[in-house]
Curated annotation (Swiss-Prot):
Species of provenance: Pseudomonas aeruginosa (strain ATCC 15692 / DSM 22644 / CIP 104116 / JCM 14847 / LMG 12228 / 1C / PRS 101 / PAO1)
Keyword Hydrolase: yes
Keyword check for Hydrolase: yes
Pathway named in the protein's UniProt entry: Nitrogen metabolism; urea degradation; CO(2) and NH(3) from urea (urease route): step 1/1
NCBIfam families assigned: PRK13203.1 (NF009682), urease_beta (TIGR00192)
Name the UniProt record assigns to this protein: Urease subunit beta
Length: 101
């Protein structure tokens, strides 16, 4: 192997395999763009985003790590969420959970 070389197995990599997902419509009711990162607890996003908030407790966007989704003012779009893994504890963000899910 050459230093810095990647040794990638053939085939596709499936993100978040085996985790529960949820598709829902989200609308930006505000007057400014809102961007949500890949690992942000969706239940706690900006209140100007309108959606079924209770259904999203313990979930995040089902997108690649380090990426984000941007919601322009007045825009509605479908997103897919995935369960938060690991210890299923949420701290910080908007402070709405601060503990176990």
């Amino acid at each position: 192997m050459i230093p810095g070389e990647y040794d990638i197995q053939p085939g596709d990599i499936e993100l978040n395999a085996g985790r529960r997902t949820l598709a829902l419509s989200v609308a930006n009711t505000g007057d400014r763009p809102i961007q949500v990162g890949s690992h942000y607890h969706f239940f706690e996003v900006n209140d100007a985003l309108a959606f079924d908030r209770p259904a999203t407790r313990g979930m995040r966007l089902n997108i690649a790590a380090g990426t984000a989704v941007r919601f322009e003012p007045g825009q509605s779009r479908e997103v897919e969420l995935v369960e938060i893994g690991g210890g299923r504890r949420v701290y910080g963000f908007a402070g709405r959970v601060m503990g176990d899910l």
